C-alpha cells in the first residue's frame, strides 16, 4: 500500500441487528442450522423468542456472524461436535470477559 492508497470500510455498531436470512448469507449456513445453534445455546435471537416456528422473524446482533463462523469452523474444519463447539464458545466468552477486567 502506498501513501496515496485509501482504505474504505463501514463502521458497524455493536448494537446493529441483522435478520436470520442475512446471518445465513454471511455465514453460508441454512436456517435449519441457525435453529440448531439457537437450541444448543450458541446463538440467542435479540428478541428472546427462541421458538423455531418464529425463526423467520429472528434478528441477531452483528456479533453473531463471528460466533457462527467460529462454530462452523470448529465443526467442519476441526471435527468438533455441536456440544463441543457450544462449550468452546462459552469458554471463549469467559476468557474475553476476564481479559476486559
Enumerate the predicted regions with their spans:
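Arg/Lys-rich, alpha-helical DNA-contact motif
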Residues: 2-25, 31-35, 39-101
Amino acid at each position: 500500500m502506498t501513501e496515496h492508497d485509501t482504505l474504505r470500510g463501514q463502521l458497524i455498531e455493536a448494537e446493529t441487528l441483522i435478520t436470520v436470512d442475512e446471518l445465513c448469507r454471511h455465514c453460508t449456513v441454512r436456517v435449519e442450522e441457525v435453529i440448531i445453534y439457537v437450541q444448543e445455546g450458541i446463538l440467542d435471537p435479540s428478541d428472546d423468542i427462541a421458538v423455531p416456528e418464529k425463526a423467520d422473524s429472528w434478528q441477531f446482533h452483528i456479533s453473531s456472524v463471528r460466533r457462527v463462523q467460529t462454530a462452523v469452523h470448529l465443526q467442519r474444519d476441526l471435527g468438533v461436535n455441536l456440544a463441543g463447539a457450544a462449550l468452546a464458545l462459552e469458554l471463549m466468552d469467559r476468557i474475553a470477559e476476564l481479559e476486559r477486567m
